[in-house]
Structures are given as C-alpha cells and as structure tokens.
Amino acid sequence: MNEEYDVIVLGTGLTECILSGIMTVNGKKVLHMDRNPYYGGESASITPLEDLYKRFKIPGAPPASMGRGRDWNLDLIPKFLMANGQLVKMLLYTEVTRYLDFKVTEGSFVYKGGKIYKVPSTEAEALASSLMGLFEKRRFRKFLVYVANFDEKDPRTFEGIDPKKTAIGEVYKKFDLGQDVIDFTGHALALYRTDDYLDQPCCETINRIKLYSESLARYGKSPYLYPLYGLGELPQGFARLSAIYGGTYMLNKPIEEIIVQNGKVIGVKSEGEVARCKQLICDPSYVKDRVEKVGQVIRVICILSHPIKNTNDANSCQIIIPQNQVNRKSDIYVCMISSAHNVAAQGKYIAIVSTTAETKEPEKEIRPALELLEPIEQKFVSISDLLVPKDLGTESQIFISRTYDATTHFETTCDDIKNIYKRMTGSEFDFEEMKRKKNDIYGED
C-alpha cells in the first residue's frame, strides 16, 4: 500500500465505483478502499435478511415465514434505471452490462384522490385511462406530439416558444392543460419531486419527458429497469471494470486519516501505512467536516406477502404520489420489487417508500404510501441526512460525492458523476471518448 497513486477512492458507493472505473479506463493508477467488508456503501444491497434486522436494531431473528435469509438482497436506497437514461448508457459504453441481468419493471402508477392509476404506456391505454377526461386527453396528446417533435437544433419545431427562456408553466398554458394533467406530466413523466420547476425554462422539462417516452419505447411495459440480485450489483460491476484495468481494491480497510499538506491532499493513512495520491474521491462519510446538510430523506423498507392492491398483481412497479395530492411540497415514491428479481424469498415482495422529509415527524408524512401497502409484515425505517460538499474540491483536490436523493432513478447520481469528472479533469465527460479508449485496450471486437 505504501505507493504513489494518481487517484485514491474511499467508499464503494455507485458514484465512487463508476468514477473509479472511468479513471482506470483513462489510464490512471487507482487505489479504491472501503471501511466496510462489503461493496455499495450507502447504496448497498444487504444480505442475508438477518443482517438487515441487526442493522436496524430489530430484536430477535426474522420469523420462519420470511424463508431463507440468503434469498434476500435488500436495497438500502430504492431506485430504478431509466431504460434510455445516462446510467444505462454508462453501463453499455463500459460493457459492464456483461456482468448484470436486468428486468423491466411491470408498471408505473400514479396516485390521485386516494386511488392508484396506471400511467398509460401505449396510446390505447392512454385513451382507455380514467386518469383524465376525453377533452383533456386530446389536449394532452397535442402536447405530447409537440414534445416528441421538439428538436433543440431546429427552431421550426419551437412553435413560437423559446426553449431557453419560456417557462414550462407557460407552455402548459399554451396547450390549455388542466391542473391534474400538469401534476401528472411534471411528476409522473418528467419526474420532478416538487413544483419548483414550473418557472424554469421549458427545455429541461421537454427533455425529461422525451427521456421518459424514449425509455418507455425501448421495452413497452414501463420506462424502468432493475438488476437481478439488487442494486448492489451495479457498484460491483464497475469495480470489476476498474480491476480489469489495473485498479487496486481493498475492502475492510479502516481509514485513519486523509493527509493534507498546504491545503492539498497528498495521501491517505490506513492501518499505519500511507498511500500517496494526487487526487481523492470519497463519499461524505469520510470527510464529515467538508460537507453540509441540506435536508433529510426518509426511506421505509416494507416486506409484504402480497402484491400491492390495484396494480394488476404486478411483481414490480413504481407508484408516484404527487405532492399536491397529499398537501406536501415533495412527491412520495414507492418502489416495489419481489422474488422475481432474486431479492426476496419466494412469494415475498419488497416495497420501499421514500421522500424528502418536510417536518419533524417524517413517518407521519409517508402515511398515505404505507396505507397502500397494508398489511405490512415488517418495516425498517431510516432517516438520512442529505449531504453535499462545501466546496468544489479544486483547491484541495478532494472531490466529494453527494448523498443519494429521494428520486427513484439514477439521473441525478449521473449528473453528480459528470460534475465531479469535470472538476477533476477540467473536461466534459464524454461517453464516446470512453468507448474509444476501451477499444484501444481491447482492440475492435
């Protein structure tokens, strides 16, 4: 370990593992350490079930009705992958897909007036849906056609709208969309957590709706994918990539000190030895004095013995509870997966509820979601701080990831990865460039 590295990475969360993989593919000498004996950090999948009981300090062993402990892989952070999103592109370009198997999530649902409705995934479903009335459907369809034809590079598709200036709220007005349709569009399709986006230029929202519909078009049932054996497989896949390119991995390594000289990182001390480095990447838990809290997320892992009611017995789904429906500022999400994904014992379902906490009693805030899941066999409640770095890290060369937010997909995580990459290298993250580098090493195959 007493060596010189270009980059040392602390923590094996998804953000850290992807950056570690990218850096090694770029020819950097990388040492990657984690104080835990397992991969994944905050975004780990916990197995066996007994370990989750211990982690959440639930007394006693899981009851026999839970089946074999080894059959469980429980994600601490619930997220799906958008089928056409940035993370899938990163997986494809780096060929990490060869280590993973994905399943399409069976449906996406939205909560309205105390009931859940399927988010239409085909035109026929849209016409038959009772989410909106007939005239609303026509106006909504016009809006979706506009979005589908919209091209940032072709002003003829703008129809008098300035994508960089016109607020999306104005665009909704132009198409005469009602409040329910606006809620549905912003929260179930563009996947915004709050209504703060309404005053922002419309370009971002249009691109988000495009991402949703392109992701949906790939597989048809829903725009979401989920890896067999749980999300913990993702960081491990990128760790393998890093190892192939000569990255060094050490788990179960207590980190004693990050050594800084004249305001700049020069190394990391572990078990009395010092590894030197030019740059450091880490998650907030390794540098508590360099991050600040900007909020909290509540997540509740619920074990069920039944599919969620009114989901057509889906073995996996997402439910979005728009904030307006429950008088909140942020949406509440439910991600549900099951034994079909090799993450639970036969006949069992895992539903994870999450949202940004807004009061001192976050458990009360998520009651509408828990009511949809009844009866719940066992629940595990976690409230975690949302932490962000206090500075960009360009002076100290210590680059800190943000904690995982309450969104149910990895787009914001990928934004963070690209942002850190730019701060570290001074250049934009380029998927194509990465692909070329891989071909140089492997040759064209």
Swiss-Prot record:
Q: Which residues carry this modification: N6-acetyllysine?
A: 112, 269
Q: Which domain of life is it from?
A: Eukaryota
Q: Into which family does the record put it?
A: Belongs to the Rab GDI family.
N6-succinyllysine: residues bearing it: 57
Annotated positions of the Phosphoserine modification: 130, 382
Q: What's this protein's name?
A: Rab GDP dissociation inhibitor beta
Per UniProt, subcellular location reads as: Cytoplasm; Membrane; Golgi apparatus, trans-Golgi network
Could you describe the subunit structure of this protein?
Interacts with RHOH. Interacts with the GDP-bound inactive forms of RAB3A, RAB3B, RAB3C, RAB5A, RAB5B, RAB5C, RAB8A, RAB8B, RAB10, RAB12, RAB35, and RAB43; binds RAB3D to a lesser extent. Interacts with DZIP1; this interaction negatively regulates the interaction of GDI2 with GDP-bound RAB8A.
Its Gene Ontology cellular component terms are: cytosol; Golgi apparatus; membrane
Which InterPro entries is this protein grouped with? FAD/NAD-bd_sf, GDP_dissociation_inhibitor, RabGDI
What function does the entry list?
GDP-dissociation inhibitor preventing the GDP to GTP exchange of most Rab proteins. By keeping these small GTPases in their inactive GDP-bound form regulates intracellular membrane trafficking. Negatively regulates protein transport to the cilium and ciliogenesis through the inhibition of RAB8A.
